[in-house]
A protein has these predicted regions:
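Basic, amphipathic N-terminal segments that precede the first structured/catalytic domain
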Residues: 1-51, 193-203
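Conserved catalytic cores of phosphodiester-cleaving nucleases, focusing on short active-site segments
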Residues: 57-59, 64-72, 91
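Intrinsically disordered, low-complexity segments enriched in glycine/proline and serine/threonine
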Residues: 33-35, 72, 170-178, 182, ...
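Intrinsic-disorder/low-complexity loop/linker signature
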Residues: 19, 28, 63, 71-73, ...
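Short, low-complexity, polybasic intrinsically disordered segments
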Residues: 106, 110-190
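Catalytic cores of nucleic-acid endonucleases
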Residues: 72-122, 142, 149
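Phosphate-binding glycine-rich loops of NTP-binding sites
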Residues: 54
Length: 203
């Protein structure tokens, strides 16, 4: 097994968006991000805890953090939705411990994007529920749609929550990320995580 310092915690969106079961990737992009699955694996190994879940990627901008979860499979029922929720909670706890910040302190600095495969036609009931919610609020069509019951996490756990199809993610977010991705911030986070591992390995 590799030593922690030999593990690469940065990877490309091409890799973090990969569906290992289907052996396909949702995002053909060379942009570098923090591979939060790898962070989680080292965290689990350090504390010798039961397997936990995590979001796929972490992006860092200035003093703000953005989790990205890629969901290529079907989101059919409460079990699938609960898995997404579990990844959110576990990832926030891991990030909180690494940064030595409470969840309250992080709430206004962390946002979340779920990228899903709209072609699978598994979102209809969630879309209907969201449209009903917006209609109930008597809001116009410009309000941001947030599917899969994730709206409740906005202002509760995250500063902002977004749910995008692959094409929406590319058009609304990817170009901005290409222009503003600061690799040095990813490297700083890697260093911080390595220090976290070293400190807790000695306790």
């Amino acid at each position: 097994m590799k030593k922690d310092k030999d593990i690469e915690y940065k990877s490309r969106l091409l890799e973090t968006s990969k569906d290992k079961a289907k052996k396909e990737t949702m995002m053909d992009s060379e942009i570098e991000v923090i591979n939060f699955d790898t962070i989680k694996d080292s965290y689990v190994q350090l504390f010798k805890i039961e397997k936990i879940n995590s979001n796929d990627a972490l992006i860092i901008r200035d003093d703000e953090y953005l989790f990205i979860e890629f969901k290529n499979g079907k989101i059919r029922d409460i079990k699938d939705v609960f898995e997404i929720y579990s990844k959110i909670y576990d990832s926030l706890i891991i990030l909180s411990n690494i940064l030595e910040k409470t969840l309250i302190e992080l709430k206004d600095r962390v946002s979340y994007i779920l990228v899903f495969n709209k072609e699978l036609e598994h979102t209809r009931k969630f879309e209907r529920a969201e449209e009903g919610f917006i209609k109930h609020l008597n809001k116009n069509s410009e309000i941001e749609r947030i599917y899969f019951g994730l709206r409740k996490f906005e202002k509760y756990c995250f500063k902002k929550v977004y749910t995008y199809s692959v094409e929406e993610f590319k058009s609304k977010f990817l170009q901005s990320l290409k222009e503003n991705n600061d690799i040095s911030l990813l490297e700083e986070f890697e260093d911080k995580f390595l220090k976290f591992l070293e400190k807790n390995n000695n306790d």
